[in-house]
C-alpha cells in the first residue's frame, strides 16, 4: 500500500465509518474500488473525487466526522489558513477563468504561494472535471491534486464577487462567495472542505458575509462560526 492507494482500514479511519459497511459499499459498486490479492484497495484520488461530489449532500453529523478526523473540531481550521490580506470584498470577474486567475492573485497575498502558475493550472484542470460551485451561492475552487511543492503552507482565500457568476451549481443559483482552498496534503484538504460545507449551512453566517464591510469583519465572522 502506498500514498496513492488506501486499504479498507485506512479508508474506514479517514471516513470514520465501519470497515464492514465500506466493504458492502465497495462490493455493490457504490465506492470506487478494486480487488487486489483478495483485498479491497481504493485509489486516493478517486476516493477524494467521490467524496467531493457527495459533500454537499452530507448531513452536519456526517460532515462533523470528516471535519474532526484529523484535529479537534473546535480548532480554528479555515481561519488558520485565511490571512486577512487574502480576503477580497469586491472581486470583478466575468468568467470562471478570470475568477480563478484573480483568486490565485488574492491567495498570493498570503506569501505562501510559491508557484502561482502551477496552482492556476491545477485549479483549471479541476474545474474542467466538474464545477466546484455548491449550494447557497458558494464555490470552493481547489486544485485537481495536492501541490506541496507549490505551497509554503496550506492556504484559503476568500472573495465576494462584485457581480455573481453562473458556475453551474446544482441548485441553479449564481455564485457570489468564493473560498479557494489549496492544501499541502489530502487529509487537510478534506477536513477544510468538510468544515466549509458545515459553515455554509448557516444562513445567518452567509447573510452576514454578504454585507460585511471589511476583511477583518469577514475573518471575525468565520472565526466565531468555527
Regions found by a protein language model. Give the residues of each.
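Cytosolic covalent-transfer regions centered on His/Cys nucleophiles
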Residues: 1-226
Amino acid at each position: 500500500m502506498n500514498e496513492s492507494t488506501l486499504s479498507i482500514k485506512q479508508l474506514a479511519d479517514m471516513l470514520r465509518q465501519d470497515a464492514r459497511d465500506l466493504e458492502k459499499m465497495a462490493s455493490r459498486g457504490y465506492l470506487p474500488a478494486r480487488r487486489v490479492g483478495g483485498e479491497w484497495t481504493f485509489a486516493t484520488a478517486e476516493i477524494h473525487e467521490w467524496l467531493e461530489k457527495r459533500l454537499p449532500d452530507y448531513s452536519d453529523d456526517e460532515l462533523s466526522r470528516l471535519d474532526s478526523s484529523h484535529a479537534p473540531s473546535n480548532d480554528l481550521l479555515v481561519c488558520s489558513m485565511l490571512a486577512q490580506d487574502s480576503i477580497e470584498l469586491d472581486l470583478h470577474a466575468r468568467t470562471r477563468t478570470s475568477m480563478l486567475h484573480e483568486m490565485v492573485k488574492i491567495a498570493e497575498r498570503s506569501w505562501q504561494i510559491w508557484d502561482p502558475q502551477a496552482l492556476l493550472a491545477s485549479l483549471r484542470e479541476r474545474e474542467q472535471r466538474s464545477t466546484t460551485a455548491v449550494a447557497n451561492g458558494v464555490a470552493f475552487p481547489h486544485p485537481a491534486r495536492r501541490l506541496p511543492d507549490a505551497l509554503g503552507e496550506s492556504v484559503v482565500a476568500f472573495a465576494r464577487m462584485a457581480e455573481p457568476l453562473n458556475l453551474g451549481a446544482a441548485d441553479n443559483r449564481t455564485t457570489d462567495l468564493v473560498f479557494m482552498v489549496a492544501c499541502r496534503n489530502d487529509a487537510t484538504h478534506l477536513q477544510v472542505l468538510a468544515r466549509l460545507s458545515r459553515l455554509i449551512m448557516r444562513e445567518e453566517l452567509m447573510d452576514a458575509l454578504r454585507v460585511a464591510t471589511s476583511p477583518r469583519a469577514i475573518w471575525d465572522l468565520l472565526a466565531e462560526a468555527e
